[in-house]
Amino acid sequence: MADRFRLRVYTPERELVDAEVREVTAEGTWGQIGVLPDHAALVTALEPGELVYRGEGGVVRLHLGGGFAEVRDNVMTVLADSGEPAS
């Protein structure tokens, strides 16, 4: 069982994140979703809100303006309408 997975977050302007992480939480259409290593395949819409991930450098928070997420083969790809690091 893997203890990390790859997180990639993109906006139309740039790549925000490309990192190995231990866990991600984000605002899904029907509530908060959590993703851990070896998560089942998933495609979901994301609501505007906070995406939080835990990696080597600790906990990181991003504000996303909605979008979509796909989880497959220990890679989570997020296509966000907009995004920036949380203050």
Where are the model-predicted features located?
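Compact, glycine-rich, soluble single-domain proteins
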Residues: 4-87
